[in-house]
Amino acid sequence: MDIHFKKLLLPILALFAMTAHAQSLSGLVTDEETGQPLEAVMISVLRNGTMIDYALTDARGRYSLPWKYNGSLQVSVSLLGYRREIRNISAAETLHIRLHSEAIALKEVQIRPGRIHGRKDTVRYNLAEFASSKDVHIKDVLKKLPGVDIDDNGQVKYKGKAIDHYFVEGMDVTGGRYSQINNNLSAKAVKSAEIMENYQSVKALKGKLSSDEIALNLKLDPQARDQWIINGTLGAGWSDGTQETTGTAQTKRDKGTLLWENAANALQLGKGKQSIYGYKSNNNGTDLSREQHILTNNTSQQIPLHGFLVQPGISAPLDKQRLLFNETHTLNANRMYKWNDERSLRLQAGYTHNRITQQRGNSQVYYQPDDTIRMDETYHYCLQNDATHMEIHYEDNKAIHYLSNRFLAESETNRGTSHELQQTMRTSQFTAKNFFSLIRNGEKYTWEFNSATQYAYLPSSLSLHDRKDKFIQHSLYNDNKASHLRKHNGFTRQYTAGIKGEWASVKHHSTRMETFGASSFSPYLSPYFQLEQGKWQGSLSLPLSYKRYFSQQRSFLFFNPSLYLRYQPDYHWKIFLYGSLHRSAGDVTDLCPFTYRTDYRTWKNTDGLFPVSTRQQYNLYGEYKNTVQEFFATATLSYRHVHYNTLNEQSISENRIVHSLRLHSNSTQILFLLSTLSKGFFDWNLKTSLDLQLSRNTGWQLTRVSDTDALTPQTETAGNGPPQKYRYDYLKMEPKLIWSPAEAFEAEYHATISYGGSKIGNDTHLAPLLDFVQRMHLTFSIGHVDLCLSGEHYRNDLNSDTHLNTLFVDASLIYKTRKWRVEASLSNLFNKKEYAYTTYSATQSYTSRLNIRPREVMVTAGYQF
């Protein structure tokens, strides 16, 4: 049977035809006197005295180097404290070396240890070589590491990809909410950071199923390990009055506001048990809610939920702390136990209360085939949010047995109000989830069972001056699957069979009661094959599923294959190719058979249609890393083509927007290039990086031009104008620099350059928008005092004739001792109070004007117990 499977699989994985093992130079390095193996010995291949390749010995003293050279070369074997050995070699062979210990006489010699060490799939950073006295928390050090970046939301990325696991001493105490560590753990408490690629978190699957996951592990200083680290912060300040514009263009001035900032947290991080407790509160624009967000990628335990009403977002291409008028309180508790490096129990709970206000005005321009419609609105908006979560996770992670059960309960309520729009929107979500996994390893086979269950209750309402719409959603979801796996001679076969079902009920209260169901049932089978041959690896997934929608009396057969090929010639290079085909049907909001409102002037109507999409995706990825040179580079070229059986139609009038589904075959295409470059310079204490994004997005939009009522059911496109084709091109570059030439000075620079233009139909070309943001942060240190100066310059186009220049300047003075940290800060020195920006989307342009935080003064005092 194995022979038949290989004959079927190998033609598909054509690149695997090269199955011969590459020749290699390998051997063992030991101590001449003791015979003990030596770790971290540098094995260098030299040509005319120049190093062309290298490897390090592992903990057992072994090394291996792919041999792809012709002619006579030299192999140098060196380790500090031992005499260097040089051998001539002309072909791959097994070369064992015994090193003689040697005393070292140092005279006016400076030994410079490496800051980064790489071995196989692990990169280790010595944080002492990157940290400075100006770094407060561990996030301040992590962002200095070549190859590592932290985005505005606090998410840690390695070579442009978000990490999948965040450990401290091998334990995930926050369950992915690692901002609670990044924003609170002292930079001095961490000794080193490890990045582990191709990380397989389940020991029972190691060596059987490959993984593309990335894990970050922090190793603490021995003096900080298992010790309680307790911090407290108190702060107060004053905010200047804001300038507000009403709907009649009259201007008034608010009085000043008293500011506060309070925080208390306690951390105990060790190898057997860990705890993190914290409370924070402020109204100075700092977004504390991010500390409760799960930032790691864990798609296997995410069950999507879709609501009918969505609260308006408070966002702009501006640092969030400048536009967020908030009152926030957040509380979290985390406790984790670990026994025998295998069994663990994690307990978590958290709560956030957030009240956000914003005043803004919007101008939306809709470009239709025969007309252009402009809609303006100016309003005050208040959003109150309360969110809680509670989690219990038990795991028994052995090589022959794996058991995991994770229970999670979450609730979130939102109330958004605008008096000018006479609109109040309430959205809530209450969920209870349980994820169970069991794996058993036999002599030849591996058995696995997984179960996922979720109950969700989503009440929501939209209150207007003349009516109230109310939705009540219930959903019970269950997915059970079992799999059988075997690996033999580098060839893995896994067969998974499961049953997935959802009971979904929706009630809509408006002028009358309307109900509908979106329940479904789906058995599925998913064969998976993986082949490893030397430098090559490939996998083929062939999932097949049947899905039945009971209320709609519709059935679908989905076949969603995917192919993955990877070539890794050596430690430095990695190339992979990915292709997939995915067919899916609409979610519960697409299946709604009646018309409903989403805000005070917008309606949505599906006309009872059943949207089905087919997506093709192709990715080509390449990366290069050189830890000795502190250089990391990646590039991704991707193409996505999605075919739809329905097309979105928009009908725009002076006081109403209607989005309807119409039967019309169409497609969208997205082509994009992503690239990241990161380079460290040891001698200059400098890190530079560049992120590049280039994309083209094309699609179709249908616009109603007849006088018929847009809310009248109409499944054909007759009577409407022809579909408009749109194209949007976008370029974005982000150069960054962090430079610490001396203990007394540090500089940080971050620029964002974006350029985007849109074409609608054959005649409408929207002027390209150029947005240029520069951020500079300088720190000067004299003894216990730091002086920080920050500047931000925003230059952005509003239209073809108008652009806006906005300059922000901040300053702070910090006094610090071993226990105390006192800071006086002045933000927005020039007292800028308004900001505006323009964006393009499909067949419309959107210009927004909003109030921003005025000049503010804050004084905070922090103490570490």
Q: Where are the regions a protein language model picked out?
A:
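Conserved C-terminal beta-signal and adjacent last beta-strands/turns
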Residues: 732-753, 763-865
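Membrane-proximal, glycine/serine-rich, low-complexity loop/turn segments characteristic
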Residues: 28, 32, 60-62, 83, ...
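A short, solvent-exposed loop/turn motif at the edges and junctions
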Residues: 46-50, 72-87, 863
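Short, acidic Ser/Thr/Gly-rich low-complexity loop/linker segments typical of extracellular
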Residues: 49-62
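Short, ordered, surface-exposed loop/turn motifs in non-cytosolic proteins
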Residues: 33-47
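Face-selective signature of the C-terminal outer-membrane beta-barrel domain
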Residues: 332, 336-354, 382-552, 568, ...
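Outer-membrane beta-barrel translocator domains and adjoining extracellular loop/strand segments
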Residues: 89, 206-207, 244-248, 279, ...
